[in-house]
Amino acid sequence: MNSRLQEIRERQKLRRQLLAQQLGAESPDSIGAVLNSKDEQKEIEETRETCRASFDISVPGAKRKCLNEGEDPEEDVEEQKEDVEPQHQEESGPYEEVYKDSSTFLKGTQSLNPHNDYCQHFVDTGHRPQNFIRDGGLADRFEEYPKQRELIRLKDELISATNTPPMYLQADPDTFDLRELKCKFDVILIEPPLEEYYRESGIIANERFWNWDDIMKLNIEEISSIRSFVFLWCGSGEGLDLGRMCLRKWGFRRCEDICWIKTNKNNPGKTKTLDPKAVFQRTKEHCLMGIKGTVRRSTDGDFIHANVDIDLIITEEPEMGNIEKPVEIFHIIEHFCLGRRRLHLFGRDSTIRPGWLTVGPTLTNSNFNIEVYSTHFSEPNSYLSGCTEEIERLRPKSPPPKSMAERGGGAPRGGRGGPAAGRGDRGRERNRPNFRGDRGGFRGRGGPHRGFPPR
């Protein structure tokens, strides 16, 4: 109880500090001097209305007086204006508000609280709106969902038990033929060094940039399995369209867009180098996900487990010059696809990971051996990590398809052009050859009976 009370007090203290900064007060204790109460605001409005009313009434009265006494109306009106205007300025002067910040124009101006106007809060404080998303990290994301948290724990244990030893190969994809890996991969993660990353960070790159024409020339279609997935980091600019073109060229269909949202809680107000091709500062990146072959979540539970994670990654923005992607992308891929043949292109020493083959030009060493790597998948279906009964029970699944009886149907009903066209027996009779129609129980034309029988 004491810890909970202490937490509430700390939040209240932080809230008062933010309000003091927002309202331009010297300290959190002086917020009351800056804010006006509702009674004071009402009194100010009444005084203003009185001043305006007295000014509006005084001028016509002076004009009528001039006309009654026969004096020159223009001279008297000018004299009255000179008498009234200084008085109006003196009366209304003390009540003119000086806007020190944008607090008056925020949502809910009657209380002068910032409420949830996160865009204006960013302008005033430098805190990005995504800083206030709750439970964004891996540790506390499923804190209120014990079933999902248990599922994640069980899947992590299974993945760590079935992962292959980490392997890595120092090679430049520009000159290295990927077909020499002699393996068809279930998952391929591509992290090309785009020029966009270095333009935003304002640093000089140690490796050459890759344009989208070079990325499209990669032989991804030659090293991907019949049913497989590719994850392509494409930045936040022109790569969103050009990345889709790459997926189509490699034989993949775009099925998802994983968005990395960058927060600045530790360094609010920090401004990045503005990209000359952008109007605003970009605070997110995209990872396009492509699918090859036929994979259905309802029938291919041995290969994919859908809806285990979300399609958002919310982490703190890396330091200036750091272009590494969040490690959470590996968790998303491993939780989703049960294939164990995983390839990471353009990897670095910091991204070497169990269960993955890392290939990149900046790696400092190599331990990849084709024969050793192939032995991990020599048995039938050994490329799959498998699934336990508990994981199968906890994971989200598609609802089972309803049977004909549950949908309220018995025998197939007639339709247009189907085997039972029309309605009931008449539709089935119509499908017989040489059918001429029955009317009133008597067949065709002529004969002893014509037309309908008498009633």
Swiss-Prot record:
Residues 407-421 have a biased composition (Gly residues). Disulfide bonds: none annotated. Residues 69-82 have a biased composition (Acidic residues). Residues 37-51, 423-441 have a biased composition (Basic and acidic residues). The keyword RNA-binding applies. PROSITE patterns: MT_A70 (PS51143), SAM_MTA70L_2 (PS51592). The record marks 145, 241, 244, 297, 398 as: Interaction with METTL3. Its main location: nucleus. The keyword Protease does not apply. One of its GO terms (cellular component) is RNA N6-methyladenosine methyltransferase complex. Residues 21-96, 392-455 are annotated as: Disordered. InterPro entries: METTL14-like, MT-A70-like, SAM-dependent_MTases_sf. Residues 244-253, 296-297 are annotated as: Positively charged region required for RNA-binding. GO terms for molecular function: mRNA binding; mRNA m(6)A methyltransferase activity. One of its GO terms (biological process) is RNA methylation. It is found in: Nucleus. Residues 134-135, 236-237, 254-257, 277-286, 307-311 are annotated as: Interaction with METTL3. Keywords: Differentiation, Nucleus, RNA-binding, Spermatogenesis. Belongs to the MT-A70-like family. PANTHER family: N6-ADENOSINE-METHYLTRANSFERASE NON-CATALYTIC SUBUNIT (PTHR13107:SF0). Heterodimer; heterodimerizes with mettl3 to form an antiparallel heterodimer that constitutes an active methyltransferase. Component of the WMM complex, a N6-methyltransferase complex composed of a catalytic subcomplex, named MAC, and of an associated subcomplex, named MACOM. The MAC subcomplex is composed of mettl3 and mettl14. The METTL3-METTL14 heterodimer forms a N6-methyltransferase complex that methylates adenosine residues at the N(6) position of some mRNAs and regulates the circadian clock, differentiation of embryonic stem cells and cortical neurogenesis. In the heterodimer formed with mettl3, mettl14 constitutes the RNA-binding scaffold that recognizes the substrate rather than the catalytic core. N6-methyladenosine (m6A), which takes place at the 5'-[AG]GAC-3' consensus sites of some mRNAs, plays a role in mRNA stability and processing. This is N(6)-adenosine-methyltransferase non-catalytic subunit METTL14. It comes from Danio rerio (Zebrafish).
